[in-house]
Amino acid sequence: MDISTITDAFGDVMLMQPSAGVFVAAVLAAILLGMSAFASGSEIAFFSLSPTDVAELEDEKTDADKKIQMLRDDSERTLATILITNNFVNVTIIMLLNYVFAGIVEFGPKAYWLQFLIITVILTFLLLLFGEIMPKVYARQDSLKFCRRCVGGILFARKLFWPLETILLKSGILAEKIIQKENHVLSVEDRKS
């Protein structure tokens, strides 16, 4: 790729006046990015509590501590809640930001590679940085404090996604049984050989 190809690509990009829908989509994407950060931080916070934190939770000093303990006791469902929430939010963010870029920037035929670069690579990087990496680093600093702040949101997401969680957990149990059965059959056949 030479410099003229790059120059032609940037010359084939036009900025457009954003509509009200584009502004709404951008605001929603920003709010959802916060929700993605919340879910990512929660994943680390709930599953990286130190033994000291766990001991403090067992004293159940606050209502939040009782709720955190309840979520930890059903850790598979809690993890399913967090993962479903995070995936749902991240997919929605990508769709909204695609709409935002389509409403602001028009890429001509010479700039299709630039469109791919901006929408796929840069948006993915920003989503990973602000929705995954930074929240996890922040949550790891004081996991118990983060858990206490987010336990209400996790319980709300748990109620919201209960049917999906149940399907996910049941299918996981079924897959585990199938794999165990296949491993048993293989080990019996290995013994005969």
Predicted regions and their residues:
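Membrane-embedded alpha-helical segments of inner-membrane proteins
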Residues: M1-R191
